[in-house]
Amino acid sequence: MNDTIAAVSTSSGAGAIGIIRMSGPEALTISSSFLFSKNKFLSPSEILPRTAIQCVFQIGDRKIDQILFFYFKSPNSYTGEDLCEFHFHGNPILLREALDAIFRAGARPAKQGEFSRRAFLNEKLDLTEVEAIGRLISARSRFELELAQKNVFGEVTRFTSNLRSQLISLKAECEAEIDFSTEDLTYESLEERKTRIENVKSLCQTLISKSSSAEKLIQQFRIVLYGEPNTGKSSLMNVLLGKERSIISEIPGTTRDYISEEILLEGIPVRLVDTAGVRETTDHIEKLGIERSEKEFQSADIRLFLVDVSKKENWKEFINKSRERLEGSILIANKIDILNSSWDRNLFSDVKDLIVLEISCKTKEGISNLLDAIKERTGKLGHSEDYVLLEERQRYHFETIVRCLDKTLHLLKEGAPAEIYIQEINYALAEIGEVNGKVDTEEVLGRIFSKFCVGK
């Protein structure tokens, strides 16, 4: 990292501000050759760190733009190197001309992600924080953004630090037992050691579980609206979207294929799917639509089964026919503003895991209760404090740690000596190092010497 890199760090296209960032040993020297103020170019000694300097970016005799310039002296910068920022007016042609001049002065084009790579290599960030920055930039919902923010501010880093500390303490105990077996020292019992390992394993499993739940929410819950024609599926779709997305008609079979649309529910992207009405038909195209409706319904995360309570009479027959589909669904009794006297929600009391809600798409009655039920089904929807987000690479390493600890427990139960099962603890520690890019085996010695009197 002896060279100096530069790149435009704002998004492409025109904007109010365009920023060029430069990092490396020659960043300040190169910068000073373009900073013109009070009829002269500024010398490096005149540029104070962490101070906004208003000046002209000038190439030779040619004034390019009135800019703000910032200098961050190593190691107190994002990359840990000397880092400079030029804040231009955001014209891409202007930025290109300035950047080309910076390259001619000795900097080279930065590679993709190279500023963050240098931050990692200079220990300004660990790998989990680098990955969190990428997630922060690409987040598609408030929920994902909040989870990325937690990782940027060290959520996974703190977890791995705690995990590592516990495993090093465990390893120190085991190594002391091996190396100082002739000393008159008291060690923890096997049961105590098993409990410690189980606790560490449980921490990892909880983390993985929270991440899996978070990933499910980020990847979109699919909520499928299902039922016979004219039960109000398309009307409910429009109500939930807050706009006319599905065609509404009294003619059965209007919706021939499923229609899907994304909404944000408590900051989480949810995919709503309006399906074709299910009925007996000879129309080939409508049959294909109904087949797709069935597939969508079966694969849904949340199933909204709509019925028209203003028309249906024989509810017991309906329950017997639809029981399998009703189980685990939310039954939406629509059109309660024109309720038929035959309707009785208690008829559904023996259907397993069924929520019955009464609504009117026309008057909006019961819609808030439906939204609450959806949130309940998704499990504390939108509360990012209940979740942790792991990248696929991180999850793999934590799952490997769990396997190492499982094997450690197995060896302990089989009566294996510490010399054998300590290797699995070593493997687990190596995996933690892979998570955040830090491995330091010397720390184990420090733990041993601080705990036991060995200096004879």
UniProtKB/Swiss-Prot annotation:
Question: One Pfam match, by short name?
Answer: MnmE_helical
Identify the residues that bind Mg(2+): 234, 255
Q: Which GO terms describe its molecular function?
A: GTP binding; GTPase activity; metal ion binding
Q: Which GO terms describe its cellular component?
A: cytoplasm; cytosol
Listed binding positions for GTP are 230-235, 249-255, 274-277
Alphabetized UniProt keyword annotations: Cytoplasm, GTP-binding, Hydrolase, Magnesium, Metal-binding, Nucleotide-binding, Potassium, tRNA processing
Record's subcellular location: Cytoplasm
EC number annotated for this UniProt entry: 3.6.-.-
Instruction: Tell me its cofactors.
Output: K(+)
> Where is it predominantly found?
cytoplasm
* Cofactor stoichiometry and binding remark: Binds 1 potassium ion per subunit.
Q: Which CDD domains match?
A: trmE (cd04164), TrmE_N (cd14858)
Q: Record's family? A: Belongs to the TRAFAC class TrmE-Era-EngA-EngB-Septin-like GTPase superfamily. TrmE GTPase family.
Checking HAMAP family in the record gives: GTPase_MnmE
Assembly and oligomerization: Homodimer. Heterotetramer of two MnmE and two MnmG subunits.
The entry's function note states:
Exhibits a very high intrinsic GTPase hydrolysis rate. Involved in the addition of a carboxymethylaminomethyl (cmnm) group at the wobble position (U34) of certain tRNAs, forming tRNA-cmnm(5)s(2)U34.
Descriptive protein name:
tRNA modification GTPase MnmE
Name of the encoding gene:
mnmE
